[in-house]
Structures are given as structure tokens and as C-alpha cells.
Amino acid sequence: MHKIYIFISYFLIPFIYLNTFIRLIKKKEDSNRYKERFGFTNLKKNVQKEVVWIHASSVGEFKSCDLLINHFYKTYNLLITTTTKTAADYALENYGEKIIHQYAPYDVVPWIDKFLDIWKPKLAIWIE
């Protein structure tokens, strides 16, 4: 089953690029940050601290992260990923310097591998 999933994800790559391009044209994607969806980043982490990664897709999920953010941000690089522009805006407006925000990469093996190679999180937490 896992091999089928990987095959399908590779097969969908051209369509994912096309969808991202359409979203850019419609202004539904941040033109300065869309490459984050493919695992790239220009963001910097404090190399003295390990990374804790919290993923919250939407604003509603992100709002439930307050205790986690306040618990981890002083000790760790706190990487927050979201999938929507609204959640990204909310995260940066409300937590700014406490967090590092990046859009979550699309669920395609090479893009996730690139993301994980860059950030090397010690802990990953998904909010559902």
C-alpha cells in the first residue's frame, strides 16, 4: 500500500505544480512563500536550539496551540506549519517572534524529505 501511495504522489506532481500556479494567479497563494509547499525555505533557525514542530492546518486548529507555544518557545526553535494563508497570517500576527512559521509541504516524499532535512525536528505535534 505504501508503494502505491508513493507512486500516486509522484504521478500527481505535475498536477500539484499546475494547481499551485493557478492558486498564485488567483492570489490564493502567497507569491513570496509558495516554494515552502515544495520543502524549500529561506527561514533561519537558531542553531543553538533544537526544533519542535507543531502542525495546525487552519486558524481554528492553530488557536488551540496557545499552551504548547508558550510551553516550548523559550527552549526550542518553535516551527509552526499551516496550510492556509489565513492561518499563516493569524500565526504571525499573534505570535511573531515566538515562532518560525512555514507553510506545510505538500504530502509528496521528496518535498517532505527536503523539509525534514532542513528542520530536523526533535518532536512533531499534529493538531487535529
Task: Label the model's feature ranges.
Residues 17-39, 43-128:
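Active-site and donor-binding regions of nucleotide-sugar-utilizing enzymes
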Residues 2-24:
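Short hydrophobic helices that act as membrane-entry/anchoring signals
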